Amino acid sequence: MGSREALLGKALWALTERTLVIAAARWEAERPAGALHTTGTGRHLNAIVSRSPGLRRLLDEEPALTLRLLTDPRGRVQTGIVTFVEALLRRDMVEFGLVPLIEPDALAYALVRLGESFLYADVLAARQPDVATANRLQQALVEGT
């Protein structure tokens, strides 16, 4: 059946996949014409993650394990989110002529790591999670504003 850590990693990825789909759908339902997919979906993703009582409980009870599963660059969760964000960036490049200052794969990775830094700030750096700042910084990286 597998180790507890492997099972928890699979469960976290399954929840993450669902959350990515929900965040994208919520943004698409309200997206104004011409608004980028990346930043709006990212705002919804940050909001959903920051309000997840199950994730907060897991971070409180098993911070080291949870952070390792969520942020390991060789793990499924971070890799999957980066791939998803890169696809959004590439879609914005095609649909809206977005010209990122750095390669889309590097920008996607930076956006995800930035989000992790602010969403999990309480565990990583004894700071309060700050979704609003994460949103502003991510938007600035994507849109240059």
Where are these regions (language model features)?
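Helical hydrophobic small-molecule/effector-binding pocket
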Residues: L36-E61, G75-T79, E86, A125
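C-terminal peripheral helix-coil segments that are non-catalytic and often amphipathic
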Residues: A47, T83-L98, A108-T145
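Amphipathic alpha-helical packing segments from all-alpha helical-bundle domains
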Residues: V21, R57, T66-G97, D105-V112
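Secondary-structure edge/capping motif, primarily at the C-terminal ends of alpha-helices
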Residues: A23-E30, L59, P63, F118, ...
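An amphipathic alpha-helix adjacent to DNA-recognition modules
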Residues: M1-A24, R43
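Amphipathic alpha-helical segments that line or abut small-molecule/effector binding pockets
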Residues: W13, P32-P53, D105, Y109, ...
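Solvent-exposed, charged amphipathic helical/linker segments at domain boundaries
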Residues: L20-R31, A35, L70-T71
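Short acidic/histidine-centered micro-motifs embedded in hydrophobic/aromatic stretches
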Residues: A14, E61-E62, L114
